[in-house]
Amino acid sequence: MTTVVAQGTFDLLHPGHLHYLREAAGMGDQLHVILARRENVTHKDPPILPNEQRREMVAALDPVDEAIVGHDDDIFIPVERIDPDLLVLGYDQHHDRGDIADALAERGIDCVVRRASEYEPGYEGAVLSTGRIVERILETRD
């Protein structure tokens, strides 16, 4: 059995998130998703929704076998517990694939790191980022 981990913020779910999770699930037999804690998101605006609400939404998706909120201090502790065969990064996540692979190896986690492909919707006007969704809401609501 191939165990896969995907990770991210998953704030205001959109089709890009679904694409990422479906693709990651298709690379193995079991998909575990680790959601970044609001307080640990420092590379962009913090999530709008609370940790547990985001986890609940992701856990409800068909491709997902388990969804957990990440550790308070150490992002690799949940990965150690899951002990995946594969960790799949989102196509636009800021993490460097090589740096993640090195950090996993330093902890003795034998895990391949891949990057998911970009989602290409088959329709016009798709809004594929939380930031753009928020902008659209602000533009259309007074």
Swiss-Prot record:
Its cofactor is a divalent metal cation. ATP binds at residues 9-10, 14-17, 92, 119. It catalyses: FMN + ATP + H(+) = FAD + diphosphate. InterPro entries: Archaeal_FAD_synthase, Cyt_trans-like, FAD_synth_RibL, Rossmann-like_a/b/a_fold. Pathway: Cofactor biosynthesis; FAD biosynthesis; FAD from FMN: step 1/1. Keywords: ATP-binding, FAD, Flavoprotein, FMN, Nucleotide-binding, Nucleotidyltransferase, Transferase. It comes from the Archaea. Its EC number is 2.7.7.2. GO terms for biological process: FAD biosynthetic process; FMN metabolic process. GO terms for molecular function: ATP binding; FMN adenylyltransferase activity. Catalyzes the transfer of the AMP portion of ATP to flavin mononucleotide (FMN) to produce flavin adenine dinucleotide (FAD) coenzyme. Homodimer. HAMAP family: FAD_synth_arch. Belongs to the archaeal FAD synthase family. This is FAD synthase. The gene is ribL.
